[in-house]
């Protein structure tokens, strides 16, 4: 694995970084979901599939695996969108200082998870444009 990253192209390294950020976000989301009882399997699977696609691009190293970057971004985008929709009770209660929805938790973990997924998606998008030829076996 060490040699794989040492000889990897910039796009692969960025995709690896995106996978690590996404994995960290997945762990944070799982803890948040279990503690505040907001866990959603579809969000979890979308974020996990984003990690798998980003890592698949790094490990497969072929022309066919280039689409895995975009698949990772699509999965992360779907996951963060669904997470945002699922967190509307927290947004409504905390921003309006009411308890209409009886939400648990604060905005800090919600905003943190959203920002981490955005960071991961942006790094993955940048990795799509960094193919310098070393990353594709013939």
Regions found by a protein language model. Name each.
Residues 55-87:
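Loop-to-transmembrane helix junctions at the membrane interface
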Residues 8-17, 26-53:
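Transmembrane alpha-helix entry/boundary detector in multi-pass membrane proteins
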Residues 97-135:
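Alpha-helical membrane-associated segments of multi-pass integral membrane proteins
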Residues 2-13, 34-35, 56-63, 67, ...:
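Juxtamembrane loop-transmembrane helix junctions in multi-pass integral membrane proteins
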Residues 49-60, 123-127:
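Alpha-helical transmembrane segments in multipass membrane proteins, preferentially the mid-helix core
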